[in-house]
Regions:
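Hydrophobic alpha-helical transmembrane segments of integral membrane proteins
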Residues: 101-136, 180-197
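Individual transmembrane alpha-helix segments
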Residues: 69-98
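N-terminal signal-anchor transmembrane alpha helix
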Residues: 13-48
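Perimembrane loop-to-helix junctions flanking transmembrane segments
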Residues: 47-69
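Cytoplasmic juxtamembrane regions at transmembrane-helix boundaries
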Residues: 89-113, 164-180
Length: 202
């Protein structure tokens, strides 16, 4: 009996490692794809985009600062992460959790790679600090999304194991834990996006 239980634990550990490796591989591949996409852009397009990004990093005076516009920009920047987190959370109670998480990670990683590559074009001495903070916060947000997707995938794995053992699909404690983790993840995105937006004002 103990040996059977040990084998089951070992199989679960292997499954967890496979999930993490799968998500990490998808994230890196899509991120590199975004970098390569920018590298393949026409030079004139890159130049135009570079000009717009540099103007964004030029900073604004406090006299021209609009608080409501600043808040709206944070909400707009957080929106893709919010939508991704909520979709991953909902589908974590289904059997297609891995597929949905893979797709969303790939999309977010690709666009993050594009954004980082475009901002990296502006890493001149004048805007180095702002651009560096922006890139660090953006990449950190992507890693937070991956970690959240990983924890939701483990929740989905636990549900499948419970169903296979003829037990209740999920307990109220598990649901509360998943909900609190979702709220904490959304809060983390708001903080990172706020810091990223402040970098544009430096």
């Amino acid at each position: 009996m103990r040996r059977k239980h040990a084998l089951k634990l070992s199989a679960n550990d292997i499954e967890r490692k496979k999930i993490f490796f799968q998500f990490a591989l998808m994230l890196m591949a899509a991120f590199i794809g975004g970098l390569c996409f920018v590298a393949a852009l026409d030079t004139s397009i890159s130049h135009d985009v570079r000009g717009k990004i540099i103007s964004s990093f030029s900073g604004i005076s406090l006299r021209d600062f609009d608080l409501m516009q600043f808040v709206r920009s944070i909400i707009t920047a957080c929106l893709p992460y919010f939508v991704s987190v909520l979709i991953i959370f909902v589908f974590s109670f289904s059997y297609v959790s891995y597929v949905v998480s893979d797709i969303l990670l790939a999309l977010n990683s690709f666009f993050t790679g594009v954004l980082v590559a475009l901002v990296a074009l502006c890493l001149t001495p004048a805007y180095f600090l702002s651009a560096a903070i922006f890139i660090v916060c953006t990449v950190t947000s992507l890693l937070v999304l991956m970690y959240f997707a990983y924890t939701c995938a483990l929740l989905s794995l636990g549900i499948r194991l419970r169903v296979s053992n003829g037990r209740m699909i999920f307990s109220g404690k598990k649901l509360l834990y998943a909900t609190l983790k979702t709220i904490a993840t959304l809060g983390t995105f708001i903080i990172l996006t706020f810091i990223r937006s402040i970098a544009l004002l430096i």
